[in-house]
Amino acid sequence: MKKLLGLCWLLFCLMLSANCANAFDREKLQAVSEIGTLSNSQQYILALDKCNSALEKYPFDPELFYWRATINIHLGESKQALKDMDMAISLNPNDSNVYVMRGILKSELGDNDGALADFEQAIKLDPKNSSAYSMRACVRIAKGEFKTANEDLDVANKLLDEEEKEAEQKEIEENNNKNKGD
């Protein structure tokens, strides 16, 4: 389960970087890229230093708080990570992925009710967020709520199937467009 949660952190970090970086600020984009590279290569102290420096320049950037939270989790600083997740959400309350990640962190800290609230908020913001349903199911299983956990897993599986079909269709369309150009 710990490896699964670790992979979830990495996946969401990469998704968040791809979706949230301000393309107009090359310096910030470069910093986020370096932070991600350092973090993904498990150079957490260097990544934390780079993130702290970037936060001095961009103190209201939710993505940087998210990255710092992720790094602090790897360093075993869960309480600081939770504060950074809270800050990321206060700066960007409409990002369902950050709620999912904070929910995972709360669950690891034993706050299953807080985790459920975060997963529910993530679903409210993005009803197609399969990870929110999957993680909510995990917490419900831990609480012995097996029926509702199964319902969440069913929804998550359907959403994942839809995502896979959409990705396949996009690839087919891209290949067709590429072949038309030849």
Language-model features, listed with the residues they occupy:
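Alpha-helical tetratricopeptide repeat
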Residues: K2-D182
